[in-house]
From Swiss-Prot:
Belongs to the PNP synthase family. 1-deoxy-D-xylulose 5-phosphate binds at residues 9-10, 45, 50, 100. The keyword Transferase applies. Pathway: Cofactor biosynthesis; pyridoxine 5'-phosphate biosynthesis; pyridoxine 5'-phosphate from D-erythrose 4-phosphate: step 5/5. The active site is at residues 43, 70, 191. Coiled coil: none annotated. This is Pyridoxine 5'-phosphate synthase. GO terms for molecular function: pyridoxine 5'-phosphate synthase activity. It comes from Gloeobacter violaceus (strain ATCC 29082 / PCC 7421). The record marks 151 as: Transition state stabilizer.
Amino acid sequence: MPTLGVNIDHVATIRQARRTVEPDPAAAAVLVELAGADGITVHLREDRRHIQDRDVEILRRTVRTHLNLEMAATRAMVDFALDVRPDYVTLVPERREEVTTEGGLDVGGQIASVGLAVEQLQCAGIPVSLFVDPDAAQLQASARTGAKFVELHTGRYAEARGEQAQRSELAQLAAACDEAQALGLRVNAGHGLTYWNVAPVARLSGMEELNIGHSIIARAVLVGLERAVREMKQAMIAG
């Protein structure tokens, strides 16, 4: 079974809604780890709409599992990551007008800039994952950058309506998982995964980690963070 990385961005979203000091993402990370999460993920966006620089700096000192920093492949963000030194970096596409990340990184269309970011980070000992659609061309481009991992974008699977559509999207994810491994890439996945759709993705051969945020934080509003994380771990092995 893959491990579970919990994205705690939306803890910061609630805090930033009132520009106050609570809830504290670092405190949330402690509870999430105590509940059995295998890693903590945060996305430091260029517009700083939720997670702030200081959050990442504190989390780097306090997280006891591993810290995965999602970020754009810009010079400023690479410099920040080189300073903070998270355990992993996941390079993601970013548009200021989007509500959440809407698709995978176009590695093939910007292979020089992505490749440079990968080289700089990995030369500093920070393994890099590329958040990409389950597309053979993007996987091949990802391998050419030298990145250690890809994170498969599961949004189309999560949004598929009807059993046939879901099976089709799951088959694409399975094929991408196999293709990535054949190219020497390690495989994670995430985006839009919930308690109700996670198990089939968790069963894909070679899947190492699932990064899940919104569904867990939404559930935590009702039952608390620790129970929400435990329930997701159970959902990953259900079915």
